[in-house]
């Protein structure tokens, strides 16, 4: 299913552990890493698609995770021209994604990327929260930056800010907080 603008509806999944690390998955047969994601089928809600993709790509079921947060808006990225399939109609120019932040509540041994006949991933690891923003393929960086900033506002409280060990994490969290304060102050002053 492709929308009128040429974007395929899709879900993205960020799974975190108790240490607030996130699951980073290696594409099958490649040296390319990303979060699990997948298309939303006709007659399927975003949440239903997320659970289906979660099982297909990571072998996890609804009882293995808890939904912590869902992105407020659809986030879009365009595919590079070299990845466009011109033999398909309509042409898909990119993905529009609804993102889910999940907490793994079962043992990590339940994660199984190889349980289907054609797995999307052949490996995974836990990485620091902001690591994917720096490492994902270029055309997805903006979406990853936006979704991780949105999730950070939910996942990290101000008490945790002082305990973050990576300077970039401190810097990014600080900039997100400043933007929110600026927006809040601007909104307050414009309402008078």
Swiss-Prot record:
<dbReference type="GO" id="GO:0006402">
    <property type="term" value="P:mRNA catabolic process"/>
</dbReference>
<protein>
    <recommendedName>
        <fullName>RNA pyrophosphohydrolase</fullName>
        <ecNumber>3.6.1.-</ecNumber>
    </recommendedName>
</protein>
<dbReference type="InterPro" id="IPR015797">
    <property type="entry name" value="NUDIX_hydrolase-like_dom_sf"/>
</dbReference>
<dbReference type="GO" id="GO:0005737">
    <property type="term" value="C:cytoplasm"/>
</dbReference>
<dbReference type="InterPro" id="IPR020476">
    <property type="entry name" value="Nudix_hydrolase"/>
</dbReference>
<feature type="short sequence motif" description="Nudix box">
    <location>
        <begin position="38"/>
        <end position="59"/>
    </location>
</feature>
<feature type="domain" description="Nudix hydrolase">
    <location>
        <begin position="6"/>
        <end position="149"/>
    </location>
</feature>
<comment type="function">
    <text>Accelerates the degradation of transcripts by removing pyrophosphate from the 5'-end of triphosphorylated RNA, leading to a more labile monophosphorylated state that can stimulate subsequent ribonuclease cleavage.</text>
</comment>
<dbReference type="InterPro" id="IPR022927">
    <property type="entry name" value="RppH"/>
</dbReference>
<comment type="similarity">
    <text>Belongs to the Nudix hydrolase family. RppH subfamily.</text>
</comment>
<dbReference type="GO" id="GO:0034353">
    <property type="term" value="F:mRNA 5'-diphosphatase activity"/>
</dbReference>
<dbReference type="Pfam" id="PF00293">
    <property type="entry name" value="NUDIX"/>
</dbReference>
<dbReference type="InterPro" id="IPR020084">
    <property type="entry name" value="NUDIX_hydrolase_CS"/>
</dbReference>
<dbReference type="InterPro" id="IPR000086">
    <property type="entry name" value="NUDIX_hydrolase_dom"/>
</dbReference>
<keyword id="KW-0378">Hydrolase</keyword>
């Amino acid at each position: 299913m492709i929308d009128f603008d040429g974007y395929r509806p899709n879900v993205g999944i960020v799974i975190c552990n108790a240490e607030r690390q996130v699951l980073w998955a290696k594409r099958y047969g490649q040296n390319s890493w990303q979060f699990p994601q997948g298309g939303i089928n006709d007659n399927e809600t975003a949440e239903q698609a997320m659970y289906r993709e979660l099982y297909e790509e990571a072998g996890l079921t609804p009882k293995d995770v808890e939904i912590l947060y869902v992105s407020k808006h659809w986030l879009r990225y365009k595919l590079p021209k070299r990845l466009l399939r011109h033999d398909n109609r309509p042409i898909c120019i990119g993905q529009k994604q609804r993102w889910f932040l999940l907490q793994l509540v079962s043992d990590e041994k339940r994660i199984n990327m190889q349980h289907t006949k054609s797995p999307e991933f052949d490996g995974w690891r836990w990485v620091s929260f902001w690591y994917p923003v720096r490492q994902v393929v270029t055309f997805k960086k903006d979406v990853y930056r936006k979704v991780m900033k949105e999730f950070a506002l939910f996942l990290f409280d101000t008490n945790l800010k002082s305990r973050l060990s990576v300077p970039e994490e401190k810097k990014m969290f600080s900039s997100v907080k400043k933007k929110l304060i600026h927006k809040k102050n601007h909104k307050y002053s414009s309402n008078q």
